[in-house]
C-alpha cells in the first residue's frame, strides 16, 4: 500500500490481493521560546488496497493496481495562512491536515525492471461573492464558489541489476491546496472589496534515489532526497482590498528565501525467525527555512534528525486469511535555532524580511515615541527546536 | 459593518439522478433489489457482500441539459463526470461473507460548486447545481448464505468553513499597511446509509435502503479591522452563509423477479423527505463604521417543499454465449417535483420529470487465458423530460413577472466492471 506514495513501481511486486487498515499519530514537543506548541491534526487512519489486474497469458501478474489513503477523523483539509510575524513551524503546522488519496498502478516490465505511476488527489476552494442592493433595497447576492480537484503525479522506477541489489528512482510533483475568494460588495454607494489568496498543505517537488542490498540475513537500504522548497509561495495570505475611507490597499508580504533541501535515509530490516521482522533507521534532512530572519517573519525550523524503529508480525492466520501486523515508532529531532532581529535605521528602506521598522514615528514632544517601538513577537530574539514523536500500527490482510 | 447572507439551493444526489454505472442507468436506477458488487455501494450497500471477487467499476457519463426559461436556454451547465466503484468481499466460512466498498462520483469540472442566485431571478433550483458534486459513499456489509444481507455506511460530503479570516489595516511608521491571517477548513459531513437485501425465493429478490439528509454548507466570515487614527476606525465584516446540495432523507424499496431464467423485472419506490428543505435566503446589512448608510434587510418566506414519491421500473434480458454474454436493458421513472407553485417572491423553476432509459452490455465471461476474471462493458442512454409549466405570480402581493420553464436532459454513459 505504501508503494503508491513511496514508489509506485513497488506496486508491481505486491503480489496477490491485500487490504491494509491502520492508524498513526504524532505528538509535538516543539518549542517557541519556553512554550510547547501542538500539531492541529495529530492523528489519522490509514487504508490501502492492492490487487493484480485480471490478465492472463503474457500479462499475467505483470500489472498491479493500488490505492493508498490517509483519513483525518473530522476534516478533509485545512488551509491555514498566518500573519507574517506569527511564530510557528511551517514544516509541521499546515502541511499534514488533509485527506490523502493516492491511486496508482505498477507494471513489471521485465523480471528485473518495474515502473509505476500514481496520482495525489485533493480539493481546493475558490470563487467570488458579489452583493449589492437590488430593486427592492434588499441585497441581491450572487455566489459562485467552486471546489476544484487537485491532482499531482508520483512516478517511479525500480531496477534489480543483481539478485542482491535493487535501485529505485521516484519523482513527486509539487502539491498544494489552493484557496481564493473575492468578496465584492457595494452598500450605499461604498465599495467593500476583499480579494484573498492562499495555499496550504504544500509539498515541494521531490526527486528520490534509493538503493537496497538484500541478503538472507537482512535488507539494508539507503535513500537520498532533493526537495525544491525554493518554489514555495509561503504560508501567508495575499490580500487586496478596497474599504470605505481607506481606499485601495494590498497586504504587504515579506519575500522569504526558502532553501532547497537535501536528505539522506538509512534503514535496516532483519527477520527474527519466521514470524517476526525487526526494523530500524536514521534520516537527516536540511531545513527549508532560512536560519537568519532579521525581519518580520518568525518561521521556526532547523535541520532534522529522525530515528525510527519498528516490528512486523507476519503470517498470522485469522479465519484462514494471512494477516501481518506492523508497528513503528519514530522521533524527529529538530535542531535548536535562535532568530535575532534587526531594526532598519530611520530612512532606511528594505523588504520586510530583511529588517523591522520603527512602528511609531518619533515625536519630539512625546517621550513615549522615542526609540524603536516594535510589536513583533520575535523581537529581539526567539528560540526554537524540539522533537516530534510519531507512531503507527497497520494490519495487512490477504484477500 | 455587518453583511450577512444566507441562502440555499436544493439538490439530490447526482448518482440518484443518472445511476451509478451504466448497468443501473439502463434500468432507470431500479437497482435496490438487484445491485451486487461495486454498483451496490450506491444502490444498496448490502450488496457489496454478495459478490464473489473484488470488483472495480469505472464509468463516465455526459448529460446535455437542454432546459429553457421563458423560451430561452436556461444556461444550465452540462453534466459530465467519472464514476468509480469498489467492492471487496471476504468469505469467512461457508455461511458468512463480509464485504466493504466505496462509490465515488467525480464531476469533470470541479468536485463541488456553491452557487447562490437571487431567489427572485427565475432559475432551476434543483437542476442548476445538483448534478455537479462529488459523491463519496464508503460502506460495509455482511451476508448470510447469499440469501440475506445487511449493509451500512455513510454518504460523505464536506462543508467549507472559515475559522478565521482577518485583515488588519493600520499605520506603521506613518504608512498605511495591511496584514492578514486565514484559517479555512473543509470539515466532513456524513449522512447514514443502511441497506437490507433478501432472496425469499430463487426467482425473487427484495431490497430496502435508507439514506439520511445531507448538505454542503459554506460559512465565510471575512473581518477587516481598520485602525487609522484620525481618519477611520472600526471594522468591516463580510459574512456569507450558503447551503448547497441539500439531499433529502430517503427510503427506497425494491423488488426484482426473474420472470424467466434470463429475464428480470425490477421495480423501486422511493420516498424523499423534501419537506425538511431549509428556509431560503435571509439577507441583512448592519451598518457601522463612519459612513453610516441605512440598514438593509429582507425576509424570504419558507421554501415549503413537499415530500415526493418516485417510482422506477426496469427490465433486463441476458443472452449467455459460449464466451461472451449480451445484456439488453430498458427502464422508466416518474419523479414528481417537490417545488411548490412559485406565486410569491421566489422564482424557482422545476417540473415533474419523466425518465426513459435504454442500455446494453457485453460480459467477457470466459476469455481465459487472456482474462482470468470476467469483465463487463455497459452502455446506457437516458431521456429526462422536465414538464413545461407557466408560473404566474400573485401580482397584488409580490411584484414579479410570470415565467415559463421546462425542457429535456439527454444523458449517455459507459462503464466497465473489472473483477480481480
Annotate each language-model stretch with its function.
Chain A
Residues 1:
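Glycine-rich loop/turn
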Residues 4-10:
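N-terminal periplasmic accessory domains that precede
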Residues 12-28:
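Transmembrane beta-strand segments of Gram-negative outer membrane beta-barrel proteins
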Residues 16, 44, 50-399:
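Outer-membrane beta-barrel porins/channels
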Residues 27-41:
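Surface-exposed strand-loop-strand hairpins of Gram-negative outer-membrane beta-barrel proteins
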Residues 34-35, 46-48:
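N-terminal beta-strand/beta-hairpin edge segment
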Amino acid at each position: 500500500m505504501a508503494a503508491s506514495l513511496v514508489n509506485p513501481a513497488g506496486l508491481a511486486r505486491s503480489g496477490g490481493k491485500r487490504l491494509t487498515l491502520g492508524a498513526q499519530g504524532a505528538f509535538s514537543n516543539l518549542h517557541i521560546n519556553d512554550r510547547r506548541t501542538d500539531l492541529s491534526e495529530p492523528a489519522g487512519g490509514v487504508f490501502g488496497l492492492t490487487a493484480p489486474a485480471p490478465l492472463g497469458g503474457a500479462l499475467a501478474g505483470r500489472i498491479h493496481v493500488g490505492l493508498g489513503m490517509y483519513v483525518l477523523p473530522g476534516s478533509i483539509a485545512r488551509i491555514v495562512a498566518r500573519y507574517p510575524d506569527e511564530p510557528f513551524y511551517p514544516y509541521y503546522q499546515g502541511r499534514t491536515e488533509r485527506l490523502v488519496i493516492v491511486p496508482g498502478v505498477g507494471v513489471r516490465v521485465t523480471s528485473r525492471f518495474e515502473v509505476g505511476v500514481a496520482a495525489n488527489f485533493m480539493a481546493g476552494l475558490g470563487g467570488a461573492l458579489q452583493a449589492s442592493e437590488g430593486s427592492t433595497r434588499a441585497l441581491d447576492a450572487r455566489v459562485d464558489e467552486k471546489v476544484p480537484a487537485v491532482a499531482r503525479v508520483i512516478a517511479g522506477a525500480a531496477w534489480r541489476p543483481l539478485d542482491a541489489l535493487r535501485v529505485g528512482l521516484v519523482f513527486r510533483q509539487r502539491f498544494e491546496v489552493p484557496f481564493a475568494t473575492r468578496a465584492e460588495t457595494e452598500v450605499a454607494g461604498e465599495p467593500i472589496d476583499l480579494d484573498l489568496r492562499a495555499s496550504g498543505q504544500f509539498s515541494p517537488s521531490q526527486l528520490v534515489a534509493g538503493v537496497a542490498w538484500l541478503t538472507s540475513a537482512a535488507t539494508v537500504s539507503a535513500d537520498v532526497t532533493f526537495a525544491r522548497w525554493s518554489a514555495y509561495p509561503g504560508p501567508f495570505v495575499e490580500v487586496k482590498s478596497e474599504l470605505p475611507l481607506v481606499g485601495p490597499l494590498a497586504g504587504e508580504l515579506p519575500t522569504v528565501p526558502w532553501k532547497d533541501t537535501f536528505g539522506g535515509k538509512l534503514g535496516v530490516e532483519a527477520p527474527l525467525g519466521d514470524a517476526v521482522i525487526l526494523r530500524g533507521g536514521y534520516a537527516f534532512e536540511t531545513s527549508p527555512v532560512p536560519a537568519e530572519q532579521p525581519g518580520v517573519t518568525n518561521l521556526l525550523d532547523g535541520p532534522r534528525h529522525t530515528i525510527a524503529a519498528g516490528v512486523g508480525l507476519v503470517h498470522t492466520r485469522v479465519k484462514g486469511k494471512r494477516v501481518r501486523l506492523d508497528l513503528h515508532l519514530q522521533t524527529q529531532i529538530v535542531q535548536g535555532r535562535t532568530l535575532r532581529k534587526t531594526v532598519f535605521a530611520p530612512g532606511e528602506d528594505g523588504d520586510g524580511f530583511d529588517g523591522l521598522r520603527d512602528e511609531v514615528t518619533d515625536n519630539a514632544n512625546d517621550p513615549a515615541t522615542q526609540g524603536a517601538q516594535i510589536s513583533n513577537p520575535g523581537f529581539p530574539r526567539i528560540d526554537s527546536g524540539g522533537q516530534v514523536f510519531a507512531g503507527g500500527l497497520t494490519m495487512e490482510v490477504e484477500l | 459593518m455587518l453583511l450577512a447572507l444566507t441562502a440555499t439551493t436544493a439538490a439530490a444526489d447526482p448518482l440518484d439522478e443518472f445511476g451509478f454505472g451504466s448497468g443501473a442507468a439502463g434500468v432507470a436506477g431500479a437497482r435496490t433489489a438487484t445491485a451486487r458488487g461495486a454498483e451496490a455501494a450506491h444502490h444498496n450497500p448490502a450488496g457489496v457482500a454478495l459478490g464473489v471477487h473484488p470488483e472495480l467499476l469505472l464509468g463516465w457519463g455526459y448529460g446535455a441539459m437542454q432546459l429553457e426559461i421563458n423560451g430561452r436556454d436556461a444556461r444550465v451547465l452540462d453534466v459530465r463526470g467519472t464514476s468509480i466503484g469498489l467492492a471487496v468481499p471476504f468469505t469467512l466460512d461457508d455461511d458468512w461473507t463480509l464485504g466493504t466498498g466505496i462509490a465515488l462520483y467525480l464531476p469533470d469540472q470541479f468536485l463541488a460548486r456553491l452557487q447562490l442566485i437571487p431567489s427572485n431571478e427565475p432559475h432551476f433550483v434543483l437542476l442548476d447545481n445538483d448534478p455537479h458534486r462529488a459523491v463519496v459513499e464508503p460502506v460495509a456489509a455482511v451476508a448470510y448464505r447469499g440469501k440475506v444481507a445487511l449493509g451500512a455506511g455513510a454518504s460523505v460530503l464536506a462543508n467549507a468553513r472559515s475559522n478565521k479570516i482577518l485583515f488588519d489595516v493600520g499605520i506603521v511608521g506613518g504608512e498605511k499597511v495591511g496584514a492578514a491571517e486565514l484559517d479555512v477548513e473543509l470539515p466532513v459531513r456524513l449522512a447514514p446509509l443502511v441497506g437490507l437485501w433478501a432472496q425469499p425465493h430463487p426467482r425473487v429478490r427484495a431490497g430496502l435502503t435508507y439514506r439520511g439528509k445531507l448538505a454542503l454548507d459554506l460559512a465565510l466570515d471575512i473581518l477587516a479591522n481598520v485602525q487609522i487614527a484620525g481618519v477611520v476606525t472600526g471594522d468591516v465584516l463580510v459574512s456569507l452563509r450558503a447551503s448547497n446540495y441539500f439531499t433529502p432523507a430517503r427510503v427506497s424499496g425494491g423488488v426484482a423477479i426473474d420472470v424467466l431464467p434470463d429475464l428480470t423485472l425490477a421495480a423501486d419506490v422511493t420516498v424523499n423527505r423534501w419537506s425538511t428543505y431549509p428556509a431560503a435566503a435571509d439577507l441583512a446589512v448592519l451598518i457601522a463604521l463612519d459612513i453610516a448608510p441605512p440598514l438593509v434587510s429582507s425576509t424570504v418566506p419558507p421554501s415549503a417543499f413537499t415530500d415526493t414519491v418516485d417510482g422506477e421500473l426496469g427490465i433486463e434480458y441476458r443472452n449467455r454465449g459460449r464466451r461472451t454474454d449480451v445484456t439488453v436493458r430498458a427502464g422508466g421513472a416518474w419523479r414528481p417535483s417537490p417545488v411548490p407553485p412559485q406565486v410569491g417572491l421566489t422564482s424557482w423553476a422545476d417540473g415533474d420529470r419523466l425518465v426513459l432509459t435504454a442500455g446494453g452490455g457485453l460480459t467477457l465471461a470466459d476469455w481465459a487465458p487472456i482474462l482470468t476474471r470476467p469483465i463487463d462493458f455497459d452502455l446506457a442512454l437516458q431521456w429526462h423530460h422536465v414538464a413545461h409549466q407557466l408560473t404566474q405570480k400573485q401580482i397584488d402581493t409580490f411584484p414579479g413577472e410570470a415565467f415559463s420553464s421546462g425542457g429535456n436532459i439527454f444523458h449517455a454513459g459507459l462503464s466497465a466492471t473489472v473483477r480481480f
